[in-house]
A protein has these predicted regions:
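Long, charge-rich, low-complexity alpha-helical segments
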Residues: 27-81
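N-terminal first-folded block
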Residues: 1-26
Length: 81
């Protein structure tokens, strides 16, 4: 977990406290959106954010997984038809 904390940071004065890759202003959400669009890890670091490493891209995924595991989500149940 400490390695993840070294790769992802949250600072109230950077992107309004949204999680970013440490030492950058690149948000975790930006990277996840590229992955969702089908962009590969390699393409992210070669074409979109050359200052990043593939390890940092993977850290964004690990961070998202950690958030899902640590939070409770409540959804309204739909009534059966």
């Amino acid at each position: 977990m400490s390695q993840l904390n070294a790769l992802i940071s949250v600072h109230p004065e950077i992107h309004f406290g949204k999680p970013c890759i440490a030492g950058t202003r690149i948000t975790v959400a930006n990277v996840l959106e590229l992955l969702e669009a089908g962009v590969t890890h390699r393409a992210i670091v070669e074409e979109y954010y050359p200052s990043l490493t593939e390890e940092q891209v993977r850290a964004c995924i690990r961070y998202a997984i950690q958030i899902i595991h640590n939070d409770e989500y409540h959804f309204a149940l739909e009534k059966a038809a």
